[in-house]
Amino acid sequence: EEYGGVFLEEVRDFGLTLVPVVVPFAFCWMLYNQNSNEWSNQYYLMNGAIFGGTDRTKSYVQSAQFSIINTIFIIILVPILGGWFYPFCTRRGWNFGPQRRMAAGFFFIVLSFAISAALAPKVEEAFLKTGRDMAKAEDYDGFYCEGCYSGLWQLPQWFVLTLGEALCSPTGVQFTYIEAGRQFRAVSTSFWLLSTSLGSILIMIFEPIFVDAGMSSGTKSWAYSGIGLFGFFMYCIASYFYTPRKQRPSINEAARLAKEAEFAMTKY
């Protein structure tokens, strides 16, 4: 019974404190998962000859190939943030801990969709002026399009999206692992990863509604941005009331001693 208090405390830590912080990230991953669809559709309307070329009969850089920029940005940004920016903030005495990193990352992912939404009407207008059929836009994936916006115009939204991912994804895994008790660390980390699947479920809920409403690409992106912003505020509220595990009162003496021993061996 004495050591059962340790388990009960870890159940409390996970269910009542970590879960409310993690659940709003389903809205974050809803946006991240949806970019592969929305941004590909946008790229179909753009000039795929981003490195030059005027041959109308061949495909240059297709949307799936252009999206590799996400991987390139991740490879660049993660080491910069972890190896230089976070230590720089610490040396300066700036409080940019895990919760604030996750908040910043969440916001940047929402912002990336707002950038895409602002660009969409101009891209569609330029595409329609060429006389091409919007319904067959996928057939023009990667093709040269005189008068269309270059696919490079998507670089800002990809950079902002990847910056958000680099801020919140590795930090979220670390946060849910360290802030959970020893017996719940695997469960807690898995729940963080599960939020990605919850994001896909949200897409399944909202996408048919937007399609039935006949929304344009830009309007749909604004709608997703608004929903993502709602999730962002949910996270901010949950984070504001969150108490770090080290500062939470223990259920009994055994739980307190176990926690002290754990933090004595863990640098965080």
Which residues does each predicted region cover?
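Hydrophobic transmembrane alpha-helices of multi-pass solute transporters/permeases
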Residues: 1-268
